[in-house]
Structures are given as structure tokens and as C-alpha cells.
């Protein structure tokens, strides 16, 4: 694959790349690029994790990058996920969550057999070098910066937290260096951790990143967008200048199950949730359905077909998102027709995951999770 083609795949559907020129240089030099993305184990997998993240993993694989999934069981424990029960977190991590991410990659056309999974607790066990890295990173980072960085856990800056939460950011940064990851990947909400990694990289004596010329380097970082939840915002209308500050609050969240879609939702559930979604006619600045079309449907399918009766103008076929957005803004596409078409597209995309969790071990793992969440 040509250098520009590899870079185009890496940059596709991303918010930003930290160290973009460094990345281009690495590709041109034939440097081995090691990717990872880490996940807290916090319940069912929704489209933000299953499709948004894994579609980028598929792009990276197509670009010839070594891809790794980090199952962050200790981080989940620190952040009180699944009731803060470490045994349950580990059980779900190596069971349901791993199965769900493999199925998600299949949904976007990737090969799950090429994925490497790492469980945090196994990486840390009897690993003095890792803990030396945590300490060294902490020594090079101020307390105030660590406190500001707890937003990577979905916590508000300035809130009261137990001390363990302050260990989370340096652990996340240390995960990068101990695994020799030169291209960490995450949603844009994890940016603060990646910036710390770049800021401390040249100061490290334990677990430094070294390129194929023997030079100490900084990790690059690829950040993708967070997709919106389907609900109506608490404040409407939203002024354009306010929207950017509110996006992290409006992102898809499994704590609001009616405003998100899980990878194994039934066809009926997918249609029900999308039919209820906030989608104002001609509104393009804040529109979750359009956001999903832009971030999920087009990157995965490359097109969207709008099916509607002849009396309402007949079927339409779009090969680019800007054209669809333009027509929606003019009122040429009705929200109901857009919703129906998006539901149909997602049902087809999610079929491999839906089928995967209908039987066998995967079905048992999902049932275990459901029972665990009820009794928690």
C-alpha cells in the first residue's frame, strides 16, 4: 500500500491526530506502528464502542498496523464500574466484552482473528517495570494536572473523588509505554491522557519509546469523534457557541439505554429507539440521526439509501454525506424517512453481532451480564 493511502486510512473519520507529521515520517520510513485502544468494562457495548471505535480499528488493520485491544479491568475497578466488583469486572472483560468487540469488528468488515487482546491485571501482575513507569510519569506531572485529567473517567473537573481516581491517569499513560505503543487511539474525551503521554515521553528512563533508528520518540495519538445520544438535550434550542462545550454531556451513554443502541439489540428495538430519537426537521447543527449518518453509516457503508413512497418524492441514494445534509437542511428529506432509512442500514450492519449473541457461549455471556446488572 502506498504511503498516502495508509495515511488516508488512518486519518479517515477522525477528530485529530497528535503528531501528524511524525506519523507521516514513520510511515515513509517503514516504521512498525503499534496501536492500542483501551476500554473500561462497564456493561453492554453500544454503537460508540462497537461501531465507531471498531470501524477505526478496521481502518488501521487495512493500513497494515498492529492492533491491540486493552481490557482495562483495574481502571474499571478504580472508576467504580459494575459496582466496583473486580471479580465481576474480570469475568465480563474476558467473556462478554471480548466477544462483543470481536463481533463488532466483524460488523464493520474486519477480521477479529487479527485482534490482540490484553487484560490489564495480567499485564500488571509481577511487572515491576510497569509500576516504575507509573511512578516516573507521576513524578513528571503536577498534582493539579492529574486532578484536571480525571475528566477522562467521565468525571467532572473539581468534583470530590477518592484518591484512587488520581492514580488512573498515570496508569493509563503507563499502559502506552509498557506495551511499546507508538500510536494510541481513543475517543476525543481521552485526549488529556494522550497529551500527558506526549509531554513526558522524552523524559522517561523506564519504558521509553524507541524507533527503529534507536531514537527516543513521543507516541502519536489518534482521536475519533464521540457520537451523540438519541435523546433531546436538556436545553433547546442550543446556541452554536454553546454546542461544543455540551457535546461530551450529549454523547451516547449506556446509562441512558433508550438513547443508545447496543450491538445486539433486536431489529424491533433498533427501530423503536430510532423512531423516538430527537431529529428536528431541517436542523443540522444538533441532530443525532445526522451525526450517526456522518460518523457511522457513510464510513462503514459508503452510502445511504432513503426509501420513501413515490407520493413523497420516491427513493433517493446518497454517496456523500454533505449532499445528504444539504438536502435535509432544505427540507427535501423528512425526519421520518431519514430515521427509517438509518434504522434499516444499522439493522443490516449489526446483523453479525445480533446473530453472534443468539446462541452458544456468547448468548450465555450476555445473559450473565444481564443478570449481573439486575442484581447489582
Description of each model-found segment:
Residues 1-228, 232-236, 286, 301-376:
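NTP-dependent nucleotidyl-transfer catalytic core
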Residues 220-261:
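Active-site and channel-lining beta-strand-loop segments
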Residues 244-319:
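Internal helical hairpin/lid segments
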Amino acid at each position: 500500500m502506498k504511503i498516502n493511502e495508509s495515511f488516508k486510512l488512518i486519518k479517515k473519520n477522525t477528530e485529530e491526530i497528535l503528531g501528524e507529521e511524525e506519523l507521516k515520517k514513520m510511515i515513509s520510513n517503514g516504521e512498525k506502528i503499534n496501536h492500542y485502544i483501551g476500554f473500561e468494562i462497564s456493561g453492554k457495548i453500544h454503537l460508540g464502542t462497537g461501531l465507531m471505535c471498531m470501524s477505526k480499528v478496521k481502518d488501521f488493520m487495512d493500513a497494515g498496523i498492529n492492533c491491540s485491544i486493552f481490557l482495562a479491568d483495574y481502571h474499571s475497578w478504580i472508576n467504580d464500574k459494575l459496582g466496583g466488583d473486580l471479580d465481576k469486572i474480570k469475568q465480563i472483560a474476558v467473556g462478554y466484552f471480548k466477544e462483543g468487540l470481536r463481533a463488532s469488528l466483524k460488523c464493520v468488515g474486519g477480521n477479529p482473528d487479527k485482534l490482540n487482546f490484553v487484560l490489564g491485571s495480567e499485564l500488571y501482575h509481577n511487572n515491576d517495570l510497569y509500576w516504575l513507569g507509573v511512578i516516573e510519569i507521576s513524578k513528571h506531572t503536577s498534582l493539579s494536572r492529574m486532578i484536571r485529567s480525571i475528566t477522562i473517567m467521565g468525571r467532572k473537573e473539581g468534583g470530590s473523588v477518592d484518591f484512587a481516581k488520581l492514580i488512573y491517569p498515570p496508569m493509563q499513560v503507563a499502559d502506552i509505554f509498557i506495551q511499546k505503543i507508538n500510536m494510541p487511539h481513543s475517543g476525543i474525551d481521552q485526549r488529556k491522557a494522550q497529551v500527558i503521554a506526549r509531554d513526558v515521553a522524552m523524559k522517561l528512563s523506564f519504558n521509553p519509546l524507541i524507533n527503529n533508528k534507536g531514537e527516543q520518540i513521543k507516541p502519536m495519538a489518534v482521536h475519533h469523534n464521540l457520537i451523540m445520544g438519541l435523546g433531546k438535550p436538556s436545553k433547546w434550542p442550543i446556541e452554536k457557541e454553546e454546542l461544543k462545550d455540551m457535546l461530551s454531556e450529549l454523547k451516547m451513554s449506556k446509562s441512558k439505554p433508550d438513547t443508545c443502541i447496543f450491538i445486539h439489540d433486536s431489529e424491533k428495538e433498533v427501530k423503536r429507539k430510532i423512531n423516538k430519537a430527537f431529529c428536528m426537521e431541517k436542523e443540522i447543527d444538533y441532530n443525532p440521526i445526522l451525526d450517526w449518518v456522518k460518523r457511522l453509516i457513510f464510513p462503514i457503508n459508503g452510502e445511504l439509501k432513503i426509501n420513501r413512497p413515490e407520493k413523497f418524492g420516491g427513493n433517493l441514494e446518497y454517496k456523500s454525506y454533505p449532499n445528504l445534509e444539504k438536502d435535509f437542511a432544505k427540507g427535501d428529506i423528512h425526519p421520518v424517512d431519514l430515521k427509517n432509512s438509518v434504522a434499516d442500514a444499522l439493522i443490516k450492519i449489526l446483523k453479525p453481532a445480533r446473530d453472534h449473541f443468539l446462541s452458544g457461549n456468547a448468548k450465555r455471556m450476555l445473559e450473565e451480564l444481564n443478570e449481573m446488572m439486575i442484581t447489582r
